[in-house]
């Protein structure tokens, strides 16, 4: 998404993470007749927090802006039919373009955008990234279609996924591991050093047979390196406990800091809104910039 902003060549303004007051300042400063596109994620994959969708849409309507929402980490996992956070929060009909992926909840490869037919036709006609990309093979499309149909009608996976994520957070917190709070399925464990982060991931795999993705700069700012854990509906209590024991062993071997006061399994996990990341407001120079 950010690469698309860069490739467009459009003027851009960066608004502070989830700070809708700052977003309104930038929108108010733009000429009323200037085409504007607000670009944001619905669920932030590194911290697990969620964008204030309704407020963003309110501002878009007030200042004549379009909206582009990245639902890559939400489709299949949120909403009554798995359409994402926008569906869950009742904002799907207020967002102009929704971006999603087939590579996460749906277990395939590829991605998509959804919007009004005239807008999608414009992208088909003018976007070189689409025009010069080979189409997905029919077997992949068939597999993705089957996965989408299943998750549209089955809520078991979504409910179980959330329950498992909550269980992982509770067990890791009880072990005094530095879990970053969130109310989504993303479970970041703070390390704060790139070499230790990579070493922790390597030890987990080599010594315990557990693969956890290390997240280093430039994916996250320097000093906020972390392990990002994403449990599935099929990780049972025994596997969760094994993960906690493995992480405790790795933390001890690397001399990493633990939380001073462990939380128990029943302590509520609250949401923290990260103020580090920022996303662009892209102002189109002309309508045919698509």
How does the language model describe each region?
Residues 64, 83-102, 121, 125:
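Conserved active-site segment immediately N-terminal to the catalytic lysine
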Residues 207, 219-290:
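PLP-dependent enzyme catalytic core of the Aspartate aminotransferase-like
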Residues 8, 62-63, 175, 207-208, ...:
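Helix C-cap/helix->beta junction micro-motif
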Residues 51, 145-211:
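Conserved PLP-dependent catalytic core of the aminotransferase class-I/II
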Residues 97-99, 106-155:
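Conserved core segment of the aminotransferase class I/II
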Residues 1-8, 21:
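Substrate-binding/gating loop at the entrance of the active-site cleft, primarily
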Residues 13-69, 232:
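Active-site phosphate-binding strand-loop segment of PLP-dependent enzymes
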């Amino acid at each position: 998404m950010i690469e698309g902003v860069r490739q467009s060549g459009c003027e851009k303004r960066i608004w502070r993470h989830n700070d809708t007051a700052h977003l309104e300042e930038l929108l108010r400063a733009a000429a009323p007749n200037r085409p504007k596109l607000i670009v944001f994620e619905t669920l932030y994959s590194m911290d697990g927090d969620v964008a204030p969708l309704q407020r963003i849409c309110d501002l878009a309507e007030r200042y004549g802006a379009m909206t582009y929402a990245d639902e890559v980490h939400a489709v299949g996992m949120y909403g009554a039919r798995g359409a994402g956070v926008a569906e869950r929060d009742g904002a799907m009909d207020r967002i102009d373009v929704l971006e999603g992926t087939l590579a996460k909840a749906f277990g395939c490869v590829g991605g998509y955008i959804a919007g009004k037919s005239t807008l999608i036709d414009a992208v088909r006609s003018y976007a070189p990234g689409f025009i010069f990309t080979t189409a997905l093979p029919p077997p992949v499309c068939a597999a993705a279609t089957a996965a989408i149909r299943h998750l549209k009608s089955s809520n078991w996976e979504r409910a179980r996924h959330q329950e498992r994520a909550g269980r992982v957070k509770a067990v890791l917190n009880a072990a005094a591991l530095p879990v970053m709070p969130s109310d989504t399925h993303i479970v970041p464990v703070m390390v704060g050093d790139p070499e230790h982060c990579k070493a922790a991931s390597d030890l987990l795999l080599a010594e315990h047979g557990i693969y956890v993705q290390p997240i280093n700069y430039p994916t996250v700012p320097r000093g906020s390196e972390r392990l990002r854990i994403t449990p599935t509906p099929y990780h049972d209590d025994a596997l969760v406990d094994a993960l906690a024991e493995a992480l405790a062993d790795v933390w001890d071997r690397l001399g990493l800091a633990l939380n001073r006061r462990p939380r128990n399994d029943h302590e509520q996990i609250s949401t923290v809104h990260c103020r580090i990341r920022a996303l662009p407001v892209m102002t189109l120079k002309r309508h045919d910039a698509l």
